[in-house]
Swiss-Prot record:
Gene Ontology terms for molecular function: proton-transporting ATP synthase activity, rotational mechanism
Superkingdom of the source species: Bacteria
Protein family membership: Belongs to the ATPase delta chain family.
Chief location: membrane
GO CC, alphabetical: plasma membrane; proton-transporting ATP synthase complex
Keywords of this entry: ATP synthesis, Cell inner membrane, Cell membrane, CF(1), Hydrogen ion transport, Ion transport, Membrane, Transport
Protein name (record): ATP synthase subunit delta
Keyword Hydrolase (UniProt): no
Species of the source: Nitrosomonas eutropha (strain DSM 101675 / C91 / Nm57)
InterPro entries assigned: ATP_synth_OSCP/delta_N_sf, ATPase_OSCP/dsu
Amino acid sequence: MAEAITIARPYAEAVFRLAQGSGSLSLWSEMLGIVSSVIQESQVNALIGNPQIPSIKLREIVFSICDKELNEDGRRLISLLIENGRLLVLPQISELYEQLKAQHESVLEAEIVSAFPLESYQLEKLISVLEVKFQHKVKAQVSVDSGLIGGVKIEIGDQVIDSSVSGKLEAMAATLKS
């Protein structure tokens, strides 16, 4: 995994610079997302890993599936990745690109896990509090984990805010043991 990220980083940075220069950040997000999902399909993934399939044929297959979604620069990127045997790292390129884009747009990704489904007004209030605290726009991924018993656990950047009942119980247990 770390090796794939290391390989993907220069590609992601180059794509980001290209997208930023041409003002097409959102377009590149869409293109990378679409092609990433296509190559993660098991049938396409098997073709990519097959050494008997020449790169020209692989390029034809990928373009036949998602050519309408790609602009000329997108096609060049896919061709380059195929020629260099790096097409399988496209999901990591997409992930790193999204991180660079979010950083550029001053958007922080937050993962919010709650014990119960949050109402829309609760989520909006929570996001607005996080935006004030971190002084950035916050984009939230929300999930439910009944194991928290109550409350929420928020991961944003490298910080964790655990205001769940299970988190408080674990903290009390650790205090009592010491």
